[in-house]
């Protein structure tokens, strides 16, 4: 257990940061799930609209280094590709 004042303070700060970061990670996952849900429904317009809002959220969380920037870019790229591919099977 933390015995010095500075160790107690660091423990408090770590708990606070952990709580904040957990909330942001949850927001990241929720943003991705919202786009996935729209893609699964097959609504390209709605999926694109939600993707724009989610992209902003994903970028903000990556800028704060809650998730790595490459992970954020990978998710955005895969979501964009999935949205782009929604109309492709119907055209064939």
Curated annotation (Swiss-Prot):
<dbReference type="GO" id="GO:0070181">
    <property type="term" value="F:small ribosomal subunit rRNA binding"/>
</dbReference>
<protein>
    <recommendedName>
        <fullName>Small ribosomal subunit protein bS20</fullName>
    </recommendedName>
</protein>
<dbReference type="InterPro" id="IPR002583">
    <property type="entry name" value="Ribosomal_bS20"/>
</dbReference>
<keyword id="KW-0687">Ribonucleoprotein</keyword>
<dbReference type="GO" id="GO:0006412">
    <property type="term" value="P:translation"/>
</dbReference>
<keyword id="KW-0694">RNA-binding</keyword>
<keyword id="KW-0699">rRNA-binding</keyword>
<comment type="similarity">
    <text>Belongs to the bacterial ribosomal protein bS20 family.</text>
</comment>
<dbReference type="Pfam" id="PF01649">
    <property type="entry name" value="Ribosomal_S20p"/>
</dbReference>
<comment type="function">
    <text>Binds directly to 16S ribosomal RNA.</text>
</comment>
<dbReference type="GO" id="GO:0003735">
    <property type="term" value="F:structural constituent of ribosome"/>
</dbReference>
<feature type="region of interest" description="Disordered">
    <location>
        <begin position="1"/>
        <end position="24"/>
    </location>
</feature>
<dbReference type="GO" id="GO:0005829">
    <property type="term" value="C:cytosol"/>
</dbReference>
<keyword id="KW-0689">Ribosomal protein</keyword>
<dbReference type="InterPro" id="IPR036510">
    <property type="entry name" value="Ribosomal_bS20_sf"/>
</dbReference>
<dbReference type="GO" id="GO:0015935">
    <property type="term" value="C:small ribosomal subunit"/>
</dbReference>
């Amino acid at each position: 257990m933390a015995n010095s004042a500075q160790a107690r303070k660091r423990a408090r700060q770590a708990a606070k940061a952990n709580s904040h970061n957990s909330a942001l990670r949850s927001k990241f996952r929720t943003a991705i799930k919202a786009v996935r849900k729209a893609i699964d429904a097959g609504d390209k317009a709605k999926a694109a609209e939600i993707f724009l809002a989610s992209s902003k959220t994903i970028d903000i969380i990556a800028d704060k280094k809650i998730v790595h920037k490459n992970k954020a870019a990978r998710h955005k790229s895969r979501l964009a590709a999935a949205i782009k591919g929604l109309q492709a099977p119907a055209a064939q």
